[in-house]
């Protein structure tokens, strides 16, 4: 279950951002949601990622934060007909050009895992 390592990375990055805000004198109450970009070729389960994140963030300001994921399709470039477009990831084992059926293709992207942003609630009284 590689979702644990991804969830741990997200939690560590967000907690580091929280520390930076608190070092600037801003009191963080909680993190409400975290928006991610996830490439389809990572084969991550968003449901499992959310579950693991809930478990490991239990005693932090991220407790209860919702992970929201936008799935990113990999792009394909055909070296024969120069087709460029989204790759259908139904069958990851067979990568062929949808236009000319050539196997002489290059993949671009699809393995992304990025934190886009997070919604953080601050104590406005300070």
Curated annotation (Swiss-Prot):
GO terms for molecular function: nickel cation binding; zinc ion binding. Zn(2+) binds at residues 78, 81, 97, 100. GO terms for biological process: protein maturation; protein modification process. It holds the Pfam family HypA. Gene3D superfamilies: 3.30.2320.80. Ni(2+) binds at residue 2. Disulfide bonds: none annotated. Keywords: Metal-binding, Nickel, Zinc. Belongs to the HypA/HybF family. Involved in the maturation of [NiFe] hydrogenases. Required for nickel insertion into the metal center of the hydrogenase. PANTHER family: HYDROGENASE MATURATION FACTOR HYPA (PTHR34535:SF3). This is Hydrogenase maturation factor HypA. The gene is hypA.
């Amino acid at each position: 279950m590689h979702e644990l390592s991804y969830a741990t990375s997200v939690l560590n990055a967000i907690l580091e951002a929280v520390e930076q805000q608190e070092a600037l004198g801003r009191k963080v109450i909680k993190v409400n949601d975290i928006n991610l970009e996830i490439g389809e070729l990572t084969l991550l389960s968003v449901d499992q990622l959310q579950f693991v994140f809930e478990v490991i963030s239990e005693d932090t300001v991220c407790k209860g934060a919702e992970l929201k994921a936008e799935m990113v399709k990999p792009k394909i470039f055909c070296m024969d007909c120069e087709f460029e477009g989204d790759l259908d990831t139904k069958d990851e084992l067979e990568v062929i050009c949808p236009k000319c059926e050539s196997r002489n293709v290059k993949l671009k992207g699809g393995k992304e895992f990025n934190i886009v942003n997070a919604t953080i609630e601050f104590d406005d009284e300070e």
